Structures are given as structure tokens and as C-alpha cells.
Amino acid sequence: MYPVDLHMHTVASTHAYSTLHDYIAEAQQKNIRLFAITDHGPDMADAPHYWHFMNMRVWPRLVDGVGILRGIEANIKNIEGDIDCTGPMLDQVDVIIAGFHEPVFPPQDKDTHTAAMIATMARGDAHIISHPGNPKYPVDIRAIAEAAAKYNVALELNNSSFMHSRKGSEPNCRAIAEAVRDAGGLLSLGSDSHIAFSLGDFTHCERILQEVNFPQDQILNVSPRRVLDFLEQRGMPAIAELANL
């Protein structure tokens, strides 16, 4: 069990079913010390309104020993790497995940997907690329792993991709883990939980990590401190309330 989960959704994304309180309670039961709420960016049809992200400043940083990161799963919008987290929103979030979603960026071809993903990393706002192994969006895996290492962006192993969503992801996810390992980059583990019971469930991710002998020192989720150090290295301000997690 890793003590950090960096991808989940609340009822603010209306196809999810749990509240912030639900996730805090689940984190306490599972000894999860830090999680990021990453509801969908506003260009998705059922995503929270822009004001949801602007008002995240009212969230507590720490509740009964559980740290909370203010995040977003932004949408990659085009081949230029634009995402739907811009302007004042950037000042309200701690962590930005970005990925392809069909209502915003319909699947195209491998070269287009690869170019868009690398452009997103190069623009510098995204910290993590979500579910890059989605078979509907084939990419040049070696190229994105090398770009992620170059731009200090983590690629995600998404546990939900092995279960409920994005059927056929496993071979791609295994290849991505191998490519990130060899490029010296970083992996982020995300439950992509849409209900609190699956918070921190990385069962399938851990199997892939073991199969490819992936180094623990290239995994963000090993500790809260590693995540916070990574975000600070990426230019995000230190979060004093989480300093002792």
C-alpha cells in the first residue's frame, strides 16, 4: 500500500459518487497520508464550474492527519498542448494532471496524440499525464517517456484502466512503465477513484511495477514528502501545513 493517491474524483464531477468528507474518512481507515482531489477540467460536459476550482482555497490543508492537495484533471485540448486550466485557476491548484478525454479531444492518430501529449508537457503547467496507456489514444511510448523525463513530468499508471475503464490498456501500461524506467523518469500512481471505497487501490499498478522491476525511487507515491518535493521542484509554492506529513 502506497500512502499517497494522486487521482480521484468527487461528486463535483457528476459521474462520481463521493464527497471530500468520504475520502477523508476512507484515507484514515487505509492510512493514506496524502491525496489529491482532481475533478475534471471545465471543458468536460459534467465537470465542475470554473468557480469550483477558484474556490478550492476554502479547503483545509490537513484534516486529522490527512493531507489534501487541491488538484484538477485538466483536458488536453489540441495538438498545441493547450489545457483547460489557465489564468487565475493556475494560482488555486497544487497539482495539475492533464489527459485526453473523448468529449474534448476526439481520438485521432498516433502522431497527433504523441505531438499533443509532448506539447502539453513542454508548455510547463501539467505535472502528471493521466492514463497515457489508453488504447483509444495510441502514442509513441518511447518518445513520451523521454519527453516526460526531459520536462520532469510524471506519467501515470492508472489502476482504473485495468478494471472499469479504457479496456485494453494493460499492454500499453506495461510498456510505459518499462520506458519510464529506462528513461529515468517518474511514475505517478492514481486510483482514478470515482467512489471513495477505491481510494488508494493500486493492486493492478503494483503488479505491473513488480513485473517490470520498476525502481521505487522513480515512483512519486512512495511518500508525501516525495510528492511535495516534486511539486516544489516544478515551481509550486511550498505548503507549510503539510511540511510534517
From Swiss-Prot:
CDD domains: PHP_HisPPase_Ycdx_like (cd07437). Its EC number is 3.1.3.-. SUPFAM superfamilies: PHP domain-like. Homotrimer. This is Probable phosphatase PC1_1798. GO terms for molecular function: phosphatase activity; zinc ion binding. One of its GO terms (cellular component) is cytosol. One of its GO terms (biological process) is bacterial-type flagellum-dependent swarming motility. Zn(2+) 1 binds at H7, H9, E73, D192. Zn(2+) 3 binds at E73, H101, H131. Its cofactor is Zn(2+). The keyword Metal-binding applies. Belongs to the PHP family.
